[in-house]
Regions:
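N-terminal glutamine amidotransferase
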Residues: 1-131, 136
Length: 138
């Protein structure tokens, strides 16, 4: 491992071998239990973010979203998830904030209905080209 780290430090100027953990992101597609499985995935990633959590599902016609402050296990139970998050596609996110305030609005995933359909997004980090993406998507 030391040899690999040495090579990477030489090749990549800003290489840092220390583990950096930020938000947890989980996705699942084409499964009738997508919301339940995605919350289980978030539970497994809980160590990556404990500020808030959210799930966005898509049922083929409409997006559904639940976002809450706190831990996954405290906010999502199977009955609740199945009722409010129908669909065969889901993305889920645990928040560990590095920028922006601690508000419900900043908990991911984000989704939007646009003139070309819709989109759901969860990311681990900062979108450095957010303005460009917005112009192309909205």
């Amino acid at each position: 491992m030391k040899k690999i780290t040495k090579i990477l430090k030489r090749k990549f100027k800003n290489f840092n071998p220390k583990l950096k953990e930020e938000c947890g992101v989980f996705g699942i597609s084409d499964n009738q239990d997508a919301s339940t499985l995605s919350t289980l995935g978030l539970h497994a990633l809980q160590h990556r973010g404990q500020e808030g959590c959210g799930v966005v599902t898509f049922d083929g016609k409409k997006y559904h979203s639940e976002k809450r402050f706190g831990l996954v296990g405290d906010n999502f139970n199977k009955e609740e998830v199945l009722k409010s998050l129908p669909g065969n596609f889901a993305i889920a996110h645990n928040r560990y904030s590095t920028t922006a305030g601690t508000t419900l609005r900043n908990i991911q995933p984000f989704y939007a209905d646009t003139n070309t359909g819709g989109i759901g997004v969860a990311h681990n980090g900062n979108l450095t080209n957010a303005i460009t993406l917005r112009k192309k998507l909205v």
